[in-house]
Amino acid sequence: MEELTVVGRSEGYLEEKKSEFFSFLVPSKSLAEFEGFISELRQKNREMCHFCSAVRLRNPTLVEKASDDGEPSGTAGRPILNVLQRKNLINCGIVVMRKFGGTLLGTGGLTRAYSEAAQSCILSAKMGRMVPFSLMNGTIGYREWAKIEKLVREYDKSPQTSFGENIQVSFLVREDKINTVLMLLKEALGGEEPFSPVERRMIFESI
């Protein structure tokens, strides 16, 4: 199953027997960044009694962490983590903060509530994949650029160009298309190979 991630923050809400569950799905590059977000929530929402969470990070190995934050063991963090795992989401985390409503939910009720609250914040999330691209750089003449501009723009609609005595061109190509693009450019330029990959970039692609 393909690993996915998110951009931007999305929120959800669940009420269960007068207890309110507010959930947040946020992109995170590190545990420190995710824990910083939780600390910020605690400072701004002191009336909440629990801030349960789960996060999955890949850089490059997979790291998973879940916290019940005072709820009975296994009733909060694990269900939240299960939601992330089912969607195969990485480099993001979910925090569910609870405002107690006066009625105990029991272990089964808590597990269900935290799971549903976690799912609710995913509903509006912008999900996608991080795709590897290569930045291609090269310097060519004006006549040569006229021969390949259309081809370059098929792969990058907004190539970067700097005009002088010659033209410096930079454009992005998906890594799985590099060999094809280089071959097409070589053919169009009569055997010349002015471009080469200089940098790898991971770019978000919506699904």
Give residue ranges: language-model regions.
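C-terminal regulatory domains involved in ligand/effector binding and gene-expression control
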Residues: 1-74, 194-206
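Short, flexible turn/loop "capping" segments at secondary-structure junctions
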Residues: 14-19, 129-130, 161-163
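A common structural junction motif
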Residues: 44-48, 155-160, 186-194
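Active-site beta-strand/loop microenvironment that shapes enzyme catalytic pockets
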Residues: 76-124
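Terminal alpha-helical anchor/extension segments at protein ends
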Residues: 117-122, 129, 189-207
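Short glycine-/aliphatic-rich beta-strand segments at the starts of folded cytosolic domains
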Residues: 126-142, 169
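Short amphipathic alpha-helix segments
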Residues: 139-157, 184
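Terminal, non-globular segments
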Residues: 171, 178-180
